[in-house]
Every structure is written in C-alpha cells, then in structure tokens.
Amino acid sequence: MAVAERLRHLFRLLSQIRPVWVTILVVSALLNFVVYLGHVRAFFSENDFRLYYAGAQVGLRYGWSHIYDTHLEQAAVAALRPAGPWYALLTPAPITWLVAPLTLIGYLDAYWVWVALSLAALGAALWYARPRHYSAALYFTWWAALGPLWFSAYEGQITILVAAALLAGWRLLETRRDFLGGVILSLALFKPHLVLLLPLALLVAGRFRALLGFATVAAVAGVGMLVTLHPDGIQAYVSTLLVPKPGGDTAETLRSALGGGTAVLAIQAAAVIAAVLVAAHARRARAAWPLVVSALLGSFLLAPYWHPQDYLVLDVAAAIMLAAGPVGAGVLIAAAVAIVSTPVSPLNNRQGSKEMILAWLLFAIAFLGFLGVRALKRRERPTTGRQSALPPSIGSSASRRFQSQGPARDVSLNADVERFEAG
C-alpha cells in the first residue's frame, strides 16, 4: 500500500503543477533560442565547425595525412570568413571525411547545412527513443529548454550526432537488436572521452553482440585512419592529444574542480565500481538503460577534458532515465537536468563558471550514486510483487496509455524496466 500511496501522491502532484513546469520549459526554450541567435551573430567566427571544415580542406588539398599539421590547419582556419581564433583539432579523422563533401558549397552554407542535418538526425533519434508514457510535444519542449543543445548547435558540434547515436543505440539494445545497437553506439567515438566506460559496461552486462558491433566499427575506423593518416599523421594526432590542454579545456573536469589528489582518485574509482555494479545488475534484469546511463555518467567523471557542449550527453542520460527508468526518479532527474541546463547554461557561461561546473558534477555524482546504490541494495523478488502494489485504476489506465502510445515492442522494454527495479 505504501507504494500505491506514493504513486497516487506523485500523479496528483504532477497533474497539479503541470501547467507551471510546462510554462517554465516553454519560457526557457524561448530564452535559449534568443541567446542562441545572439551567439550566432556575435561569435560566429569562434564556432567549432570551422575546425572540421578546415581539416577537410587540408585533407583534400594536401592529403589526409596532413590534417593534424598545425601550420596547415592554422592557415586553413585563418582563411575562413569571418576569421576567428584557431584551436587544435582533437576530433578523430573521420569527422573530416564526413565534412569533406560540404566543402563544395562553401563555408557559410556548409555550416548551416551541417547544423540542419545534425538537428534533423537528433530529432529523428528523439522521436524513436521518446518516452511512450509522456506527451511527445512535452518531451520535445523539455529538450528545447536544455542549454547544451543550443550551444552545440551554435558550435556546429559533432556532439549533436553523438547524442543522436546514443539515444538510437540505446533503444535498439532495449529491443534486442544488439549488434545494430552497438554499431550505432560506436558513432559516439567521434568524441571518445564521452563514452570511456561504455565498452566496459557492455562487456559486464553480457551484451557481447553489441560490443562486437561497437568494436567492428571502431576497428574499421581505426584501419581507415592508419591507411589515410600514415605513421606521420598518426604521430601528429597523438602529439595533439598529449599536448597539455589549455585551462579552458580542463576547467570543467572533476580533477580540475577538486584540484586533483586522493579525493579525485577515490571518486573516479567509485564511479567505475558503480558503473560495473549497475551493468552487472542490468545483465540479470536484462535491461539496457541502466548500463548506458551509468557509463555516460562515469565517463564524465573520468574525462581528461570537457567542453560546455559535452554536457549534452548528460542530457541524453537524463532522457533515457525519463523514458525507461522508474517514473518518479525519471521525472526528478529530468527536472534536475533542466534546472542545471538552463540558468547556468553554457550559452550564458561560455567559459564555464564555477557554479555551472559544480552543478553538473554534483548532478552526475548524485545520479550515478543513486543507480549504484539501487543496484547494490535490490534483491531478487518476483516482479509481480510490484505490480500487485499498483492500484487497479492506475495500473489499468497506465497500461492502456502505454499500449496506445507506443509500439508493441515497448511492452518488452517495460518488462525489462520492471525486472531491473525488482531484481
């Protein structure tokens, strides 16, 4: 009865405050859009797409083995108009292959086409991975209220495609298409530091076919880089990665925020252990969402560098939790990430304020801690126990709503979630 009472109270509370938080989300989305337009006008010359575009130009003109040549890259960036500062290209070489066709239409047009295609891909992934038990309009409004999405759009960042791949790949795992899910998830390797723990989580969770798909694409990309970059290009790329990062690149990492030391190592070790525990429990429960979410959160805490647009993957973690996790916890996480994403948005704190950094770190630690403790404390019990605690009215209406809004395969997803909660 206690569970039933909590559910009744939660549903009553959500229905009472729904107009308020819908209004807040709409206002936040509009404000983000206004600030985004201001950034495009004032800081267009500083976007990250320039680096992809310049790298593609260098590869086409001088050979792909030269795309990490500092002098050639600097010259290519300086030739773009409007001119802006140069930053080292840290993204793996396939990003330049992807952008290369867009060099045919010129830099300005290429930027807008790239952003439009990226947002279209994300929109398709959002629709595919959307929660079936919430309004799609509300879900998309929630996404529009998240600052990292708008900042990534301004930057022309590959992070948007990474987010799309993570959402679509997760949903494929939930529907038992593991190999294809692993292939799609591997697209996140455009920014490897965002998914450091994902292969380990797939391994521990027993998702071997997904890991095979992930590793296959990674191997093909690796061979492609070896063939096109040659030893000199590989050495130049490794040197770029090993060069001490500017303060702006590392300021938003756990190590930088806490100043290094034993505390950082302890938190990072705990993050790895928590991700492993969650993945092991997800293996027994046959659910994919916990392992993907915990891997993303743990990767953030381990990352050697982090940029404002990278917070988009934490928004992805919250979106997956909202779609597949426990209802109450999912709503709270979604509300928390909206709060963190908006008032301290990277659109308003381009260099990363201490408040923004600490807010994200605390969010990730609390979120991962919740999943880890949950996996540790849950004991095996029949899944019917939880179902019997639901009031008949809630259970039947929720079941009808779920079946009417989602495809048949989501019934298995819901069952997996139930097993994870009960297992």
Regions picked out by a protein language model, each given a short descriptive name:
Residues 96-97, 144, 188, 195-196, ...:
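Hydrophobic alpha-helical transmembrane segments of integral membrane proteins
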Residues 231, 322-394, 413-423:
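Aromatic-enriched
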Residues 190-193, 220-224, 330, 334:
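Membrane-embedded alpha-helical segments of transport systems
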Residues 12, 85, 141, 185, ...:
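Residue-level detector of alpha-helical transmembrane segments in integral membrane proteins
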Residues 2-16, 378-403:
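Membrane-interfacial, low-structure loops and terminal tails that flank and connect transmembrane helices
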